[in-house]
A protein has these predicted regions:
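Catalytic-site signature of metal-activated, phosphate-bearing donor transferases
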Residues: 6, 66-73, 84, 90-219, ...
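Acidic helix N-cap motif at the loop->helix transition within catalytic regions
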Residues: 18-21, 43-52
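Conserved donor nucleotide-binding strand/loop of the catalytic core
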Residues: 47-71, 75
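Short aromatic/hydrophobic "clamp" motif used to bind/position activated sugar donors
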Residues: 81
Length: 364
């Protein structure tokens, strides 16, 4: 008797001719059903999608991502639903893990949380990731919520799986689509939830509307109703804004404010180290960078928030290299560059430092 679960892939797309085949080729072996919901493509997206599935539906765009995704989910007929964006792929190693999961998944599981790898360094190492409820039981009828930066509201039995979805966008310019949706909602007098406040502030940040971003991050934080990971991220973004505005004291306070919500994260420790280093306060810079080297990335990843892996690996070490070099402790500086080289052996700064130390030591 074959108890292997069946999987529906659900996607919403618009003008994705450059990426949709790459995405579907990477996942077609896993899925028993492919559902594509098109929200108004004017390119060859629909023509390309028809090569993979007959289950292609049109959905009039109403400036609401959750409604489009819920429509796609409503068309699924298999045991579980997998969702992807057209610029996502599943790499071969991750596909093998998911094929095994498909064979062994206990049907009492309601949702599977998986890594979402969003950015990479020049060597292909993951630098920015988060977790997503990526595979969900269809019969639970979980719903998407939110016009923009929508999320899937899940409950019940949730397991973690280390097979990742990889984001591989081909677009170089930041879209202002989400910003315009939020601005129209504001103009229409719609009430923003704490989550809306946070993501609208993020859109303002991404488009360098810093004063507007500050106002909405503050409104979000003062609501006291935000998810702790979003609160931590808001503090980080506030600190970054104040650094860019050359308001260092405010940047320090914003970074420290993140500690109200959880134990320190390496991202914020490195930010504090950076501020103190620019102020030539080397001892304080060393303190914060050193703390970053001692923090557990696994703990951070298990929170479900965004994690910038470089801050848990090579960045604090290369910055400690700079700090100790300025302090005249050449041995310590060399030691930390070697630590950084273990994590990022081809990083240009690491290689430059390696050559620098070789010259220094050859003269002594």
């Amino acid at each position: 008797m074959n108890n292997m679960v069946s999987i529906s892939l659900c996607m919403i797309v618009k003008d994705e001719e450059d990426t949709i085949e790459r995405c579907l080729d990477s996942v077609k072996e896993l899925c028993d059903e492919i559902i594509i919901v098109d929200t108004g493509s004017t390119d060859k997206t629909k023509e390309l999608a028809r090569r993979y599935t007959k289950r292609l539906f049109d959905f009039k765009w109403v400036h609401h991502f959750a409604k489009a995704r819920n429509f796609a989910f409503s068309k699924a007929t298999k045991d579980y639903i997998l969702w992807l964006d057209a610029d996502d792929v599943i790499l071969k190693d991750d596909l093998q893990k998911l094929l095994l999961l498909k064979q062994t998944l206990d049907q009492s599981v309601d949702a599977v949380m998986m890594p979402y790898n969003l950015a990479f360094d020049s060597s292909g190492n993951v630098t920015f990731s988060s977790k997503r409820h990526r595979l969900v039981k269809r019969s639970r009828n979980f719903q998407w919520i939110g016009a923009v930066h929508e999320y899937l509201a899940v409950g019940g039995k949730i397991i973690r799986q280390d097979a990742a979805v990889t984001h591989r966008s081909t677009k170089t310019e930041k879209s202002d689509r989400n910003l315009k949706i939020y601005q129209q909602n504001l103009k229409d007098g719609k009430t923003f939830s704490p989550r809306d406040l946070y993501y609208y502030a993020n859109e303002c940040f991404d488009h360098s509307l810093y004063d507007e971003a500050i106002a909405h991050y503050e409104k979000f934080l003062k609501s006291g109703l935000g998810w702790s990971e979003d609160c931590i991220s808001a503090c980080d973004k506030l600190a970054e804004i104040f650094i860019r505005k050359n308001e260092q004291d405010k940047a320090i306070k914003a970074a420290l404010r993140s500690f109200e919500y959880d134990l320190p994260r390496a991202e914020h420790c490195c930010k504090l180290g950076y501020i103190y280093l620019t102020q030539q306060n080397i001892d304080k810079a060393i303190f914060w960078y050193d703390l970053a080297t001692k923090l557990d990335i696994q703990r951070a990843e298990n929170t479900g928030g965004f994690v910038q892996k470089a801050y848990y690996t090579w960045i604090p070490h290369i910055q400690l290299c700079v700090c100790y070099d300025r302090n005249g402790n050449i041995e310590k500086a060399f030691e930390h560059n070697e630590k950084a080289r273990e994590y990022a052996p081809t990083n240009p700064s690491v290689l430059y430092n390696k050559e620098y130390f070789e010259k220094r030591f050859s003269k002594s």
